[in-house]
């Protein structure tokens, strides 16, 4: 009987862990990206902001709203082009007292990998405040966040994709070719 009670307790505990591991999305709040100093997209989901490329005023605004960590998915080539990004983002973020995490994604040199997702999860876990995740127009950021919801927050892939589409995930090219929505299954 004693082992049976331990077994029941363990099963109950594991079921609670599964329930609490799922991300509760209170809402996806779309903000005025241009007015706040961001390119194309700015949304808030709980303690995470997802956006396109921030201007300095955008970073200032998010710092005032409690953002302490900025995760940038743009490549070095993108970030070093002063015609595209007219300031040194990493240095500016440092001057604001915020943490800068660079996970470049895009092209053969910076492929989408499980390691990139692991780095993002670590950045989220280590953040002591709100987090900004950004790329150029929030497309890569939407994809990374969607994968994060599946791998680390227990959402099924179709639910995560629907949430990602509310930001800037877009449609799968296959859906455009076939002119219909595709449903994916986890294996």
Can you say where each PLM-predicted feature lies in the sequence?
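Cys-dependent protein tyrosine phosphatase-like superfamily
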Residues: 22-131, 146-187
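A phosphate-binding catalytic loop at a beta-strand-loop-alpha-helix junction
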Residues: 132-142
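Bacterial N-terminal signal peptides
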Residues: 8-18
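Bacterial N-terminal signal peptides that target proteins for export
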Residues: 1-8
């Amino acid at each position: 009987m004693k082992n049976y009670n331990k077994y029941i307790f363990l099963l109950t505990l594991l079921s609670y862990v599964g329930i609490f591991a799922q991300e509760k999305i209170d809402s996806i709040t779309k903000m005025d990206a241009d007015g706040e100093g961001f390119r194309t997209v700015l949304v808030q989901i709980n303690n995470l902001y997802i956006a396109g490329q921030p201007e300095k005023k955008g970073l200032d605004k998010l710092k005032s709203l409690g953002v302490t960590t900025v995760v940038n998915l743009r490549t070095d080539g993108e970030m070093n082009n002063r015609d595209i990004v007219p300031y040194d983002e990493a240095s500016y973020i440092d001057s604001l007292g915020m943490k800068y995490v660079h996970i470049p994604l895009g092209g053969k040199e910076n492929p989408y990998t499980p390691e990139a997702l692991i780095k993002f999860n670590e950045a989220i876990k280590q953040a002591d405040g709100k987090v900004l995740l950004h790329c150029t127009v929030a497309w890569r950021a939407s994809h990374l966040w969607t994968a994060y919801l599946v791998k680390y927050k227990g959402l099924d892939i179709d639910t995560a994709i629907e949430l990602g589409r509310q930001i800037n995930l877009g449609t799968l090219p296959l859906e455009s070719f076939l002119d219909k929505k595709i449903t994916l299954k986890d294996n």
